[in-house]
């Protein structure tokens, strides 16, 4: 109230005492934002304010305000958890670039900046470290939708659907896990670490470091830790080794004269200087035995060499994926396994490390896509919004929320709610 005139009102039954939502009604906000905030319903508001720690899953019919909830939940969480989380540690995964353009205009008006906004494909590029050629999912969708009118290729299309579903499943992830275990068992050199004739560390001890001591790290970071251990061990033993080398040199030089004596002396001196000055080089020579592949090469090896032709779906999967990889092309469903291989072997960049993710139109993603998000989050802090009835890429997506929760959040307290009213 200003000069006995009502200038503004706020329904505290909806917005409560949060300055964030109240400020969103200030004059600087455009009419679109005011309309959004003004129409938030009580049931939507309860979802917006749900605690951050548990996974929140919202099944909402068309027009129930899922996107409004997604945007306001991000704003609410950032404001109320500002001491625990930075805005850049939040991420919204949207289905299309068009949708991203829409929310990028709304979030700043809610006082939200620096939140990562991307499609699943964009996030995959960040995790993998390079942009990949992805076949158009819409072309596949057109083929699948027209299946009933294509009697000739109906059987092949059915297998295509099963392949996409299988690649997006937790079952496929478990096969990738088995493959990664095989890589882990063969990752480090099988030989002991020696300097000349001197054992510095046995294979068994190095393997124990790799598989037990540093198992919490990705494979690449484990090697970095092992490198430190090997350098340290080499330094410890270097004085004794140098002393022994000098004794050998003296013994060998006793019966030599002239040029032969100089050659032998120089040979031993070179070894001593290497040991005194270049521990890293010696250790690197040992670790250079480790295979130099990237995540795409590992995925090719997985498809071509590890997967078994157990049934017609797997035969099609192997052939189709292998042909695409030879053309440097992948499908959307290949992103999750490639991301997973990258994450487990090489880790991810700092910019990919997030603490809470909001996924809109979640019904179009499969179990494997959600599982890799959980791995990267290293927690269950997710807001998942979708509508099973509105699945566009239903052939690879979620069919049943209960089954999805049982797979992805088993033994985890999960908040599941439905919005059945269109506003």
Tell me what each language-model feature is.
Residues 1-23:
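N-terminal accessory nucleic-acid engagement/regulatory domains that precede
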Residues 38-50:
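Pre-Walker A adenine-sensing motif
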Residues 52-56:
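Pre-Walker A (Motif I) flank of P-loop NTPase domains
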Residues 58-60:
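Hydrophobic anchor at the beta1->P-loop junction of P-loop NTPases
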């Amino acid at each position: 109230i200003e000069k006995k005139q009502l200038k503004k009102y706020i329904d505290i039954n909806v917005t409560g005492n949060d300055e964030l939502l109240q400020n969103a009604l200030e004059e600087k906000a455009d009419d679109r934002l005011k309309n959004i905030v003004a129409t938030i319903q009580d049931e939507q508001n309860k979802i917006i304010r749900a605690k951050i720690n548990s996974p929140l899953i919202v099944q909402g019919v068309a027009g129930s305000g899922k996107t409004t909830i997604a945007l306001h939940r991000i704003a609410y969480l950032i404001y109320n958890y500002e001491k625990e989380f930075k805005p850049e540690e939040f991420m919204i995964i949207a289905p299309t670039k068009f949708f991203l353009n829409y929310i990028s205009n709304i979030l700043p008006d809610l006082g939200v900046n620096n939140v990562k906004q991307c499609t699943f494909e964009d996030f995959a590029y960040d995790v993998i470290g390079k942009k990949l050629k992805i076949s158009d999912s819409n072309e596949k969708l057109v083929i699948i939708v027209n299946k009933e009118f294509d009697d000739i290729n109906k059987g092949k299309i059915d297998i295509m659907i099963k392949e996409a579903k299988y690649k997006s499943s937790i079952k496929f992830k478990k096969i990738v896990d088995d493959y990664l275990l095989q890589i882990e068992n063969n990752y480090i050199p099988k030989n002991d670490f020696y300097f000349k004739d001197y054992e510095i560390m046995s294979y068994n001890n190095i393997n124990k470091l790799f598989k037990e001591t540093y198992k919490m790290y990705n494979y690449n970071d484990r090697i970095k830790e092992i490198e430190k251990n090997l350098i340290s061990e080499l330094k410890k033993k270097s004085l004794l080794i140098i002393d022994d080398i000098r004794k050998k040199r003296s013994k060998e030089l006793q019966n030599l004269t002239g040029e032969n004596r100089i050659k032998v002396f120089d040979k031993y001196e070179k070894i001593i200087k290497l040991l005194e000055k270049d521990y890293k080089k010696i250790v690197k020579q040992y670790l250079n035995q480790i295979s130099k592949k990237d995540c795409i090469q590992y995925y090719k090896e997985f498809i071509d060499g590890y997967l078994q032709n157990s049934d017609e779906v797997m035969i099609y999967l192997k052939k189709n994926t292998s042909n695409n990889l030879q053309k440097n092309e992948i499908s959307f469903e290949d992103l999750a396994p490639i991301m997973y291989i990258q994450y487990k072997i090489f880790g991810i960049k700092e910019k990919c490390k997030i603490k809470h993710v909001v996924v809109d139109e979640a019904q179009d993603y499969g179990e494997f896509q959600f599982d890799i998000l959980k791995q990267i989050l290293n927690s269950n802090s997710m807001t998942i919004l979708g509508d099973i009835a509105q699945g566009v890429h239903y052939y690879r997506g979620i069919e049943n929320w209960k089954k999805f929760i049982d797979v992805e959040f088993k033994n985890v307290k999960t908040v599941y709610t439905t919005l059945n009213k269109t506003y």
